[in-house]
Amino acid sequence: MNTCITCGMPFTGEHENEIGMETSYGPVCIHDCEDGDIKEPEDIFAGGVAYFVDNVTDGDFDLAERLTRRNMLSLEYWQENPFEELEGPVASESEYAEAMAKL
C-alpha cells in the first residue's frame, strides 16, 4: 500500500489523489507539504495531534500527542530525521491499536 512518508496516511479511497509531492523516501501527502517542500516537522506533528484529537481521542490532547509520537516514530522518514517533539512518552500498543481501530 502506498502511504505518506511523514504521516502514514494511505493513498486509497478518498485520499487516492492526495499525493502532494514525491521525494527520494517516497510520496508526501498534500497536508504535509507546501510550495514543493516538506513542512516543518513541528507543524506535521501538530497536524497529527489535531487529527487524533478530532477523530480518535475525544479531546484527550495528551493521548493524541502519544499516539502521534508512536505513529511518526514508526515511519522510516522520522527515524532518519528525528526532531525534538518526538522525544517523550508514546502510546502503548493497546492504546495505538484501539485508536487505529476507530479510523
Question: Where in this protein do the model-derived segments appear?
Answer:
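Short cysteine-rich clusters marking metal-coordination/redox-active sites
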Residues: 4-7, 29-32
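N-terminal pre-domain and mature-chain start segments
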Residues: 2-5, 101-103
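Short linker/helix segments within small regulatory modules
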Residues: 16-26
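Short flanking/linker segments adjacent to small metal-binding domains or redox-active Cys/His motifs
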Residues: 61-103
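Charged, low-complexity interaction regions
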Residues: 56-59
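Short Cys/His-rich Zn2+-coordinating modules
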Residues: 7-17
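Short metal-binding segments enriched for Cys and/or His
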Residues: 30-51
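Amphipathic alpha-helical segments in structured regions that serve as interaction surfaces
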Residues: 44-53, 64-72
